[in-house]
Each structure stands twice: as C-alpha cells, then as structure tokens.
Amino acid sequence: MALLQIAEPGQSAAPHQHKRAVGIDLGTTNSLVAAVRSGHADTLCDEQGRDLLPSVVHYQVDAIRVGFDAKREASLDPHNTIVSAKRMMGKALADIDTRQQPYEFVAADNGMPQLQTRQGLVNPVQVSAEILKKLAERGAAALGGELDGVVITVPAYFDDAQRQGTKDAARLAGLHVLRLLNEPTAAAIAYGLDSGQEGVIAVYDLGGGTFDISILRLHRGVFEVMATGGDSALGGDDFDHLLADWIKAQAGLEGQLDASTQRELLDVAAAVKHGLTDADLVPCAFAGWQGEVSRHLFEELITPLVKRTLLACRRALRDAGLEQVEVLEVVMVGGSTRVPLVRERVGEFFQRTPLTSIDPDKVVAIGAAIQADILVGNKPDAEMLLLDVIPLSLGLETMGGLAEKVIPRNTTIPVARAQEFTTFKDGQTAMAIHVVQGERELVADCRSLARFTLTGIPPMAAGAAHIRVTFQVDADGLLSVSAMEKSSGVQAEIQVKPSYGLGEEDILTMLSASIANAQQDMDARMLAEQQVEADRVVESLNAALAADGDALLSTAERAAIDSAITHVLSVRAAGTTNQIKDAIEAADAVSGEFAARRMDASIRKVLTGQNVNKV
C-alpha cells in the first residue's frame, strides 16, 4: 500500500529530499531512540556509546537532569528523582499505589497525579516530556538536523487517556508525532517484515513496568492484531521488589525503609537480578548483611509472576481462536525476557524456541524507526498495513439504561462506524449522548467515557427525527464521537479523553463479568426494552386520549383504555418481561378501534372541502 505524499501548498518536499525521522521506545525503566540510516535500522547512542536511556528525571533548583545523571541521584535525592513515570501516565491519583513511593503526591483538579519537586509540581506528562526531549536531541544530533517526525511506542493495552497523555508529552517536547504504535506491533515489524515471514506470531513483551502479549497474523505485508492481553502493572520492577523484600528480610530489617535506603535496596536487587542472567550464584551485600543469591531462589520468588504472564497468553490465544501449536514464531521483547526462567517457561508454553536474535531491549525501537521512515515519506513504495484492535466495545446509552454497542471489541483500527437513533418524545429538541465502554448490556455495568448534548433538533413527532451518531477511532486508538440530525444538519462532537486510565486487570475483570453474567445481562436487557416500550405505549395513548378521547370514545370505551393503561404501568413497575409484553398487547387490542377512528377522523379532516375528482 503506497502512502500518499501530502504537503501544504508551497511546502512540497522534493522527491530526493530525505526527511529525518526516529522511532522512540518510551519505556518504564529505560527508553531508546532508533533511526533508519543507509537502509539499516538501529538504535542511536549517546557520547559514551550507550543506547539505553534510564527513564529517570531529577529536578534540581535550577536544572533538570535526565537519564544516567538522574539515576545516580535516585538514592541520594529520591523525593526529587522521578522514576517509572509511565506507570502513572493517564491515571488518576486514586488509582496509583503510592505505598513505598518516596514522592509527595498532590491531586490536580482533574484528578491527575502531581509530584512535589524543587521546581514545583510536575505531572507524569511533564516528566515523560523531559525524557522525550533528551531522546529527540540524541536523534537530531545523529541525523544532522531537526526531526521531521517521530513514532512513539506504547503498550497495546494503553487506553485513550494513557495514549493521549503520551501524545501530550510529545507535544510538550516539541515533537511532531507521526503515529503512536503498539509495542508488540513494532517488534513484529522489526522481525516479521525484515525476514519476510508469514503466519501467526506471538509477541511476548515483558518490560520494566508492563507486560503485553499480542497474537498477530502477518499475510502479504498486512499485520492484523488478532488478540491482545497482558498486565499494565507487571514487569521487571516487580521482580526487583520481590528480591528486595527477601534481601531486606535477610538483613534483619523490619518496617518501612526511608526513601533513600529503599532506593539503594532496589538498586542492589536489580544488580543481583542482572547477574543471575549468566551466573547461578551472585554475591550480595546490603546494610551490613553479606551473602549469596542463587538463581534457583530467584526463580522460586518470581515463578508466580511468570505464571501470571502465561495465563494472559492463554487468554489471548483463546480470544484469537487459536491453539499454541498454530503459533509459528514467538518474539521476545523487553529486558526482562533475558531472565532464563522467562525464556524457558515461554518456550515450554508455546512449544517452540522463542526468537531472541534481535536485542529484546532494542527490537521495539527498531520497529518504530522502520515505521517512522515509511510514514515520513522516505519509502513511498513501501507496502505495510498495520491493523491494531480496540480492547473493549464502544457504544452509547439508549432509553432504559441500555448499552448499544457501536464498535465491537477486537475491531481493527482505524475504524469509523455510524448508527441512527431517534427521539422518544414529541417535540424533543435535544438529545443527550452518553458514550460508554464495556461488554455488558446495561450502562450501569459499563464504564462511562464521556457525555455531550446535541441541541437544535427541529420539533417533530416522536420517532420522526433521524440522528446519526458516528464513532471514529484513529490509528492511535483515540476516540471521537459526533452526532448529527439529518434534516437540519445540526451537529455536535466530542473528543473522548477520560480523566484516568483503565488498567489491564480492570479490562480482564470487565470481560470476565460479561461472560459470567451473559444470560442475566440479556434477561435484564429484554426487561428494560419492554419497560421502554411500555413507557412509549402509555405516553402515546395518553396523548391520544387528551386530543380525541372525548370526541371519539364512549364512557365505557374510555374506561377500558384507562384500565389497560393502569395495568401496563402496574406490570411495568414489578412484572416480568413476558407480563409487560402481554400487558402491552392487551392495551393495543383494547385501543385498536380508537386508533382506527382517529385515522378515519384525520382522513375526513384532510378531505373536507376537496373535489372528489381531484382526490
């Protein structure tokens, strides 16, 4: 699929002009920047030859340090040294586990977490922007000029708020974002397209703070994400914490450590973990205690976490409708996949040796660089189509508190879907649009994303207006919703930016609940639909009685209809679905003759004074 070259008038790039673009892997623990140079994609190093940049920012009174310089301050000045900001991206303060974190948290008016530093309050978006600036500077220096665009990778399960936060950070850093790219998809680009493979690929991505599993199908240059899963709060940092707790116990320390000591302990644990990648026994010393840590002990500590990742793999395969044997290749991504136990268990689960030929720390950045090179226009003849998916269905609330799905779960993006809705009452001039996310049938069981109101609808009979509601999810997974009344053209639109993110555990809980309550939800939906129909019938009959009851009905006939209305209202409040349906049918039967008389009266009124020959 050749990409169209589009530019502002007078700014068209010459065909031979090579644009500067980089791919950025904005990680929880470390970040990287990569670029395609002379047709080869590779990571870019700093002046000391290091390609990894610790995702750490240290705030001084008159300066901001990023990377290795900041990391050295983590144990000396933990209150002003922000690590793992990615874990907080797009979340409300109430959703962040602040225990064992050395920061002073303050909630902003919108619930966003803010951290008190020497330079005042900063939020995760601002912290991430500093990291992106540093990486962009490295990219510009390596490529010889200002960058024309960047592709930034995010975990597959980042929701709207987390993705928007990432884009905001890039904008704050002065970067032009070509696209946000799912990390597993980036890894598949680096492996799959370079080697020309086709088939089903599993991408196992275990980084410092997040875990993602993606099942992708690659066919004739088309990547389709068949299913995704993972845990946005599980990674190598958690391995460090488990080992740190063990070391702390061996050192005879109890209670909560001060921030500086806790940071020093985590650094010791991380060093031991790295040593155990190649050795069976690693010496360890902390707080006066000296000893050794064996690989066997470390593996015992982390086995429950590794099992959690494999359960997510099993769920993703089930969602894709596949068995392990149907997976042709398993791509390992993230520094934590260097742990021998992880590689061993993943190999056993998928029944094949995982691919590790590309450095697991670099593979995502390399894939992002390849994609950036294409999107910026350096490879206009490149053929590549990436089809990511949305993790939960998107829809809106209809009468009776029902959730009407507009875009089902696992739909590939970008996507736009539209449905038509109508008014419920005569003369209705406005409609409230409530956007929801989830798999349940009732709005009360789904997650509310946004609300807006379409006003200026021309007054007309109930059901006569045609309101077209369009849901659009762009290539970055960001949602916009618009509503338009077709006869008048009045419209309203909203960009959905939730105030906080949705964690992987929340998503799994929502999916599990939808399965466990499927029959109950459907029963509740059918009941709500009948209740809405009962309301419509009662309102319609009352309006008809008010207009023509005295003129067209006898006292007995009116009493019968009034009795039917009372019965519908009574059953609607406490009856079953079938009882409400029977009451509505009974009311229709009793009022049928009245409806016919009203129709005759309307026809006579229209024909009054008309020449028969003209009718």
Swiss-Prot record:
Kindly indicate whether the keyword Protein biosynthesis belongs to this entry. Answer: no
Arranged from A to Z, the UniProt key words for this protein are: ATP-binding, Chaperone, Nucleotide-binding
Instruction: Tell me the name of the encoding gene.
Output: hscA
Instruction: List the PANTHER family.
Output: HEAT SHOCK PROTEIN 70KDA (PTHR19375)
What protein family is recorded?
Answer: Belongs to the heat shock protein 70 family.
Any Pfam family hit: HSP70
Q: Which PROSITE patterns match?
A: HSP70_1, HSP70_2, HSP70_3
Q: What does this protein do?
A: Chaperone involved in the maturation of iron-sulfur cluster-containing proteins. Has a low intrinsic ATPase activity which is markedly stimulated by HscB.
Task: Give the species this sequence originates from.
Answer: Aeromonas salmonicida (strain A449)
The answer to whether the entry has keyword Nucleotide-binding is yes
Which InterPro entries does this chain map to?
ATPase_NBD, Heat_shock_70_CS, HscA_NBD, HSP70_C_sf, HSP70_peptide-bd_sf, Hsp_70_fam, ISC_FeS_clus_asmbl_HscA
The protein's name is Chaperone protein HscA homolog
**What does the record list as GO biological process?**
iron-sulfur cluster assembly
List the HAMAP family: HscA
Molecular function (GO) terms for this protein are:
ATP binding; ATP hydrolysis activity; ATP-dependent protein folding chaperone; unfolded protein binding
Which CDD domains does the record cross-reference, listed alphabetically? ASKHA_NBD_HSP70_HscA
